[in-house]
Amino acid sequence: MLQHKILGLDVGSRTVGIAISDIMGWTAQGLDTLRINEENNELGIDQLVDIIKKHNVGTVVIGLPKNMNNSIGFRGEASLTYKEKLLEAYPSIEIVMWDERLSTMAAERSLLEADVSRQKRKQLIDKMAAVFILQGYLDSLH
């Protein structure tokens, strides 16, 4: 059993998908999607810190989008910046960067296979991508 839950994040330019682990650290469940505005530096960090405290989170896993050649592009740099902003606001939190290549595509495919409507997919995709990111990390622990 974990002492603290683990949060998974899929950071985009307009939304942050959030998933959370069960207390055993076996499964990831979608929790929420934060609306952000990266251009205006409105990153939802205060809301995220509230979620971390409310759910007794000890570790945050942030998806790190890499290019297929393993280099880090613009979105990857944005995720690393998000990590720094979160650490400034909450220095005691452990943050793990997790290779998230293809997680959004996998989430989209699973929603398509579940026959979820296009409108509903748009609402769920970021949260589902966060679930894929966190589940990958949890699986690596066991």
From Swiss-Prot:
Its EC number is 3.1.-.-. Disulfide bonds: none annotated. GO terms for cellular component: cytosol. One of its GO terms (molecular function) is nuclease activity. InterPro entries: RNaseH-like_sf, YqgF, YqgF/RNaseH-like_dom, YqgF/RNaseH-like_dom_sf. Keywords: Cytoplasm, Hydrolase, Nuclease, Ribosome biogenesis. One of its GO terms (biological process) is rRNA 5'-end processing. Its main location: cytoplasm. Pfam families: RuvX (PF03652). It is found in: Cytoplasm. It comes from the Bacteria. Could be a nuclease involved in processing of the 5'-end of pre-16S rRNA. Belongs to the YqgF nuclease family. PANTHER family: POLYNUCLEOTIDYL TRANSFERASE, RIBONUCLEASE H-LIKE SUPERFAMILY PROTEIN. This is Putative pre-16S rRNA nuclease.
